[in-house]
Amino acid sequence: MIKTFSFILVAVIAVLFVVLVIRVGSFKSRQVIAEPTQTLAISRAAAVAHLSEAIQRKTVSMPAANAGEFVALHTLMERAFPRVHRELTKESVGDHSLLFTWRGKDQRLKPILLMAHMDVVPVDPTTESSWHHAPFSGEVADGYIWGRGAMDDKESVFAILEAVESLLTSNFRPERTIYLAFGHDEEIGGINGAAKIAALLSSRHVELECIVDEGLNVFTGIISGLDSPAALIGIAEKGYLSLQLSVETAGGHSSMPPEHTAIGTLTGALQRLQGAPFPARLSRPTRGMFEFLGPEMSFDKKVVLANLWLFSPLLEKTLAQSPRTNALLRTTLAPTMLNAGITDNVLPSKASAVVNLRIIPGESIASATQYVRQVIADPTVTILPFPIASEPSAVSNVDTASFAILHKTIHQTIPAAVVAPALLVASTDSRHYRSLTKNIFRFLPVTVGPEDISRYHGIDERISVEDYERCIRFYAQLIINFNAPMR
C-alpha cells in the first residue's frame, strides 16, 4: 500500500514537473521588433531652456490665486512654439486649460489625443531648505532640470509641444487629426480643466482612436528578476474615494469619562479597518504585466509566472509584503486626516477622520463603501463620501492597433526596455475622457529608479536632460507612427 502510494506521488510530481517545464517553454516573449527611426532635428539647448522657464512659473493648483502664473506660462508657450500657435487651432477652456487641434488630411480617420497638465502641487515650506536647488528655480545642473513640475507634469506639456513644433518645421502634416489637451487643475480633480475639455469634444461628437496621458514610467532596479528597464503602460487606473468617519457623543469633563468616548469609538473603527484589508486578487492589468515581463525574467521567476494557475497564492503573498506592490493587489485604504478635541481636559463631543481609498478595477465605489461599513459594524459611526470621487477605469485592450503602435514607439525610442501593460494606482485626468474612447494609455518615458519614487510631489523633483530629449523624440515618433497605415 505504501509502495503504491509512493509510486503515485512520484508520478504526480513527475507529471507536475513536466507541465511546469512545458508551460515555461511556451511562455513566449510579447516584445516587438521595431525598425530604426529617422533622427528629428531638435535643439536640446532651446528645449531645456523652455522647460526651465516653465518650471519657474508657479502654476500651483489654485488657479484663482495663481491666474497670473498661468497667463505667464501661456505667454511662454506662444513665444517658444510659434509654429504651433500659427498652424494649430488653440482654444482656452475653463479659464486656463488649453485645447490645440492639428487638423489631419483624412477626416475619415479617428483622431488621437495627447494629454498633460500644467498645474503642480504646492511645495511644503518646511521642506524648501532640503531641496538641492530651489523648487521653482528651474535650475539646470549636473545633467538635470530641477524643480516642481519637472516630473509631474510640465515635462509632458513641453515635450509634446517641442515635438509638434519640430514636426511642423520638418513640414510633416498628419493624416489623422491630433488633439493636444493641457489641463490646469489635474492635481485637484480636473473638474474645470480636463472635464470641460472632454465635455467640449463630446458636444462635437468626437470619437477618438486613443488617448495617451501621463502615468507610468520606465522603471530601473525596481522589479526583481528583470535586468532590463521596464516600460510600464497604464491600461487602467484605480478609482478614488474619500470617506469621512464621524462620531458624536455628549462630551463633558474628562474626569468623568463614559465607557465609550467619541475618540475611543472612532479609533476603534480605524483599528478595525487597518486590521481587515480588502481581499487580494490579481486583476487583469496586473496579470497582463506579468505575461509581458515574465518571459524576459530569470528562470525561477519564469517558472512562477508561467504557472499562475498553481503559484498565484505565492505571488500574491510576495506582492503583499511591499506597500508599492500591495497596491497592485487590492483596494487600499489609508487614514489621512484626524480631528477631535479643543483642550486637554474636555471630552470632545465630536471626532472625525478621513480615509482615502484607491479602488481596484472590478470593484466599485458602492462595493468599497459597503465593505467599510461591514468592517466598522458600528451604527454610531457616520460614514459620508466626499463629493469628488471616481470609479475605477475600464481596462484598455492590449490586442489593439493603438497599443501595438505605442509598444512599437517605446521600442524605437528606448530599445533596451521591456514593455508591459500595468495598473496605475493613482488617478489622472484621463478619467474624464472615458466616454470618448476605449483605448486610454498612461505612459511617460521618464526613467525612474528606487531613489526617484519619493521625488513625485516631494523634495528634489527633477528630470535628466537626456530623458527630456527622449520624451520629445517619443512624442514625435508616436505622432509619426499613428499617421502610418494601421494594421
Predicted regions and their residues:
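N-terminal Sec-pathway targeting helices
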Residues: 1-13
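Acidic/His- and Gly-rich active-site-bordering loop/insert found
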Residues: 12-150, 169-174, 355
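Acidic-enriched catalytic cores of C-N bond-cleaving enzymes acting on peptides and small amides
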Residues: 26, 30-34, 201-210, 217-228, ...
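An extended, acidic, His-containing surface patch that forms the Zn2+-binding/catalytic region
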Residues: 42, 90-91, 101, 107-109, ...
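Short, solvent-exposed loop/turn and secondary-structure capping segments
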Residues: 65, 123-128, 190-194, 222-225, ...
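Short glycine/proline-enriched loop/turn "hinge" motifs that connect secondary-structure elements
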Residues: 129-130, 171-173, 234-240, 327, ...
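Acidic/histidine-rich catalytic neighborhood of metal-dependent amide-processing enzymes
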Residues: 144-232
